[in-house]
């Protein structure tokens, strides 16, 4: 069987789940990462050093490797690798969304322009340089508005402003974040600009889907029961199946398919964030990759198939017996960071696991490591997973478990 090229960052949460899925399928894996892996010398055919920021040399390296060791599919685990995955797949003639479509989805400003031009419901928006003055753009967009970095993923750097003073404070804070050497180096030209959008009220959901030949299969629709109204937009709880009325769920699926089509996305996984209000669904973000962090552990299909196995089967052209999610409701809480500092201790995990419905608790930040909350931070303290008969019972279990955890010994950094 031909190899799978899995493109990941060395800091990825997602690599393990894809490697496990490949192991279940008996598919050999080549891991492509921006830095050499620790065991690369012991297994030279199992890894490639690929810098997503140097696209042409990275694609050439993949093509040269594939000439000696055939590759049957290319999958990116995270946002940083999706354009490289698309370009490598195109060079090898493999099944994947096009580079142009993936790049359009990755560029928040370009995505907004495409959607507005095709008549899809979109907020007012403007792009501006971090060296500029946001007040003129805000006069065109209006208040309340949301500042979004073009170079960062998820909710990092995203802030709401209800008036000019809040706008200037948020803009200064975001410009400072984007000017950090590591962010500027990773983001390139995108790190020098931000997007200003009119704020969209409504309940927020996340749709996990798989595109095949332009057809969208909805794998799961997650409710986000905690209001996401700003000033920062920290996601905490995801619960599926959604409790929205069926017509609303259908409208969300239709809107997502329309956005994917407008961008040219036609193959592979997508993770979409939408808001639903009295005017209907509004696309917030759509990413040409699967759900982030460890959140995919909430999803099982057919006879216990993981999301990652489903994605790999699609990419490799293998049979998929069922796209149906399991009967039980499931959910995850991404444990928020209450304040900046150094994590000195975490307690209450034994008590939290005793809550009915809780399946797993993982604290992913090592003791002694510095933690930073949103909008500057890029991670969570960990994850809580639950299953139950109803979405309501799952949400209640997640909240009860979180209440039993204690991170009250987060102290100031460099003490």
For each predicted feature, which ranges?
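Short amphipathic alpha-helices in soluble, non-transmembrane regions
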Residues: 173-175, 346-349, 394-403
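Beta-strand scaffold of nucleotide-dependent catalytic cores
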Residues: 159, 169-173, 197, 204-226, ...
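Glycine-rich active-site loop/lid that clamps phosphate-bearing ligands
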Residues: 336-367
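ATP-binding N-terminal substructure of ATP-dependent carboxylate-amine bond-forming enzymes
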Residues: 1-101, 129-132, 363-381, 385-412
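Conserved ATP-binding module of the ATP-grasp superfamily
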Residues: 121-123, 140, 144-147, 160-201, ...
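Active-site "cap" helix and flanking loop/linker of ATP-utilizing ligase/carboxylase catalytic domains
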Residues: 2, 250-272, 278, 287-345
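A conserved helix-loop-beta module that forms one wall/lid of the active-site cleft
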Residues: 90-157, 164, 176, 180-182
């Amino acid at each position: 069987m031909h190899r799978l090229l899995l493109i990941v960052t060395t800091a990825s949460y997602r690599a393990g789940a894809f490697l496990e899925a490949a192991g279940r399928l008996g598919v050999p894996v080549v891991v492509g990462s921006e830095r050499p892996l620790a065991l690369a010398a012991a297994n030279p055919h199992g890894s490639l050093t690929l810098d997503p920021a140097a696209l042409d040399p990275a694609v050439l390296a993949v093509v040269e490797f594939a000439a000696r060791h055939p590759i049957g599919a290319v999958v990116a685990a995270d946002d940083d690798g999706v354009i490289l995955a698309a370009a490598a797949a195109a060079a090898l003639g493999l099944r994947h969304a096009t580079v142009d479509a993936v790049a359009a989805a990755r560029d928040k400003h370009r995505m907004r322009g495409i959607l507005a031009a095709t008549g899809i419901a979109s907020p007012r928006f403007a792009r501006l340089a971090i060296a500029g003055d946001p007040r003129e753009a805000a006069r065109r967009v209006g208040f309340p508005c949301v500042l979004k970095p073009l170079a960062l993923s998820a909710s990092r750097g995203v802030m709401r402003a209800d008036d000019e003073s809040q706008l200037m404070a948020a803009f200064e804070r975001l410009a400072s974040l984007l000017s950090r050497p590591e962010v500027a180096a990773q983001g390139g030209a995108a790190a020098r600009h931000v997007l200003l959008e009119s704020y969209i009220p409504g309940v927020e959901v996340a749709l996990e889907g798989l595109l095949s030949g332009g057809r969208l299969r909805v794998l799961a629709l997650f409710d986000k029961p905690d209001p996401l109204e700003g000033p920062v937009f920290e996601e905490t709880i995801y619960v599926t199946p959604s409790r929205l009325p069926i017509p609303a769920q259908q409208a969300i699926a239709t809107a997502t398919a329309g956005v994917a089509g407008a961008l040219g996305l036609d193959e592979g996984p997508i993770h979409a964030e939408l808001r639903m209000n009295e005017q209907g669904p509004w696309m917030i973000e759509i990413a040409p990759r699967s759900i982030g962090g460890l959140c995919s552990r909430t999803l099982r299909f057919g006879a216990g198939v993981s999301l990652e196995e489903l994605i790999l089967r699609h990419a490799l052209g293998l049979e998929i017996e069922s796209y149906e999610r399991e009967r039980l409701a499931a959910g995850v809480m991404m444990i928020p960071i209450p304040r900046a500092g150094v994590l000195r201790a975490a307690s209450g995990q034994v008590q939290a696991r005793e809550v009915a419905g809780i399946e797993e608790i993982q604290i992913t930040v090592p003791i002694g490591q510095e933690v930073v909350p949103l909008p500057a931070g890029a991670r969570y303290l960990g994850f809580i997973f639950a299953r139950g008969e109803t979405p309501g019972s799952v949400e209640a279990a997640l909240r009860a478990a979180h209440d039993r955890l204690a991170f009250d010994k987060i102290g100031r950094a460099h003490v």
